[in-house]
């Protein structure tokens, strides 16, 4: 366990450091940040025949953290004092995911094929809280001769954010086939249907903290489910063993959520389409790729306003396009 030290404080008015040793702590030596991560992962492969096999997998991840700190909010070089906020927070996230697919290699006439079909599922459970961040110390600390008192966070929270949560479940079903028409020309295509169910929101600490419009029980700012069929298509043509051109088209579907910010209307999933075309050169010494891309998204969420007036809105479409160049090589042995 290491003491959590944020270091010295930057004076925002002058963009300079206070005239004290940089090693001097203005928070508290008992600041604490701890985290624990557990991971379980296993895969099974079963050969059905010479050209077919069955794959299955499961993974579990858990992440827990806790922090307790005195956070510097202001340094007054004239009075030689620093003001700090005493905060405490903990969180727990668990992710279960599993997959099952079948892979087959076969020929249709002179065309070799690699076929994949499967299903995957994921459950993500994230709980944050309790969060105590309402306590400012009554007395400031002297920056020249600090007296560390090991303060404890006051167990109160009056803004309705003491507990935050996001529960997400997804299921995907997919098929994909890669066809080798010749040694030089390869095409791949696939379909994927993805479904999600999501609940996210917040509530306050207890009845005494709940103000008008705040919730003591779990009520979601986001409570939704949806699904969509997605397409993917790609092609590669090799002019020589070292030079190839390629083109790819794909679609995306991503659920969005709001924990603390009210949502204006329905928070629809973000959807995207991307297209890329380019050329690639590769030999034993280096490889280079030049590509043009175009990415468009719709149902993009954006926070409008601030503080108590903040609201999450769907702002419409976004588009990005450009040129990408990548070069990798081995300079020496």
What are these regions (language model features)?
Residues 1-47, 60-93, 136-166, 170:
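Acidic/polar loop-and-plug regions of large Gram-negative outer-membrane beta-barrel proteins
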Residues 10-21, 89, 94-105, 114-116, ...:
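Solvent-exposed loop/turn elements at secondary-structure boundaries
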Residues 25-30, 39, 43, 83-89, ...:
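Extracellular loop and loop/strand-boundary signature of outer-membrane beta-barrel proteins
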Residues 34-38, 92-96, 167-171, 225-229, ...:
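Residues that define the transmembrane beta-barrel architecture of outer-membrane proteins
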Residues 37-43, 51-105, 168-203, 228-254, ...:
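Surface-exposed extracellular loop regions of Gram-negative outer-membrane beta-barrel proteins
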Residues 43-59, 63-69, 238, 245-246, ...:
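Membrane-embedded beta-barrel scaffold of Gram-negative outer-membrane proteins
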Residues 64, 112, 116-240, 262:
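Signature of Gram-negative outer-membrane beta-barrel scaffolds
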């Amino acid at each position: 366990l290491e003491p959590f030290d944020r270091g010295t404080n930057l004076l925002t008015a002058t963009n300079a450091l206070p005239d004290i040793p940089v090693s001097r702590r203005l928070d508290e030596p008992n600041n604490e940040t701890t985290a624990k991560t557990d991971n379980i992962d296993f895969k099974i492969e079963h050969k059905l025949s010479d050209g077919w096999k069955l794959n299955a997998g499961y993974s579990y991840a858990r992440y827990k953290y806790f922090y307790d700190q005195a956070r510097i909010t202001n340094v007054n070089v004239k009075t030689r004092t620093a003001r700090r906020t005493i905060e405490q927070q903990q969180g727990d996230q668990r992710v279960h995911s599993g997959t099952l697919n079948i892979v087959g290699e076969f020929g249709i006439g002179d065309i070799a094929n690699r076929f994949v079909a499967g299903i995957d599922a994921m459950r993500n459970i994230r709980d944050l809280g309790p969060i105590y961040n309402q306590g400012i110390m009554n007395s400031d600390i002297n920056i020249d001769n600090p007296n560390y008192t090991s303060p404890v966070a006051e167990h109160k929270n009056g803004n309705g954010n003491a507990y935050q949560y996001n529960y997400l479940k997804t299921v995907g079903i997919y098929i994909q086939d890669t066809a080798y028409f010749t040694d030089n020309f390869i095409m791949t295509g696939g379909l994927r249907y993805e479904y999600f169910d999501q609940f996210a929101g917040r509530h306050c600490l207890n009845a005494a903290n709940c103000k008008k419009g705040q919730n003591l029980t779990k009520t979601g700012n986001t409570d939704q489910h949806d699904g969509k069929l997605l397409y993917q298509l790609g092609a590669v043509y090799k002019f020589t063993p070292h030079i190839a051109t390629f083109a790819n088209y794909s679609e995306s579907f991503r659920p969005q959520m709001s924990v603390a910010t009210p949502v204006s209307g329905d928070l629809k999933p973000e959807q995207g389409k991307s297209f890329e075309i380019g050329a690639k050169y590769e030999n034993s010494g280096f490889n280079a790729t030049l590509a043009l891309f175009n990415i468009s998204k719709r149902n993009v969420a954006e926070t409008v306003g601030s503080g108590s007036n903040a609201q999450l809105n769907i702002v419409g479409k976004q588009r990005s396009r450009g040129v990408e160049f990548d070069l990798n090589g081995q300079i020496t042995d």
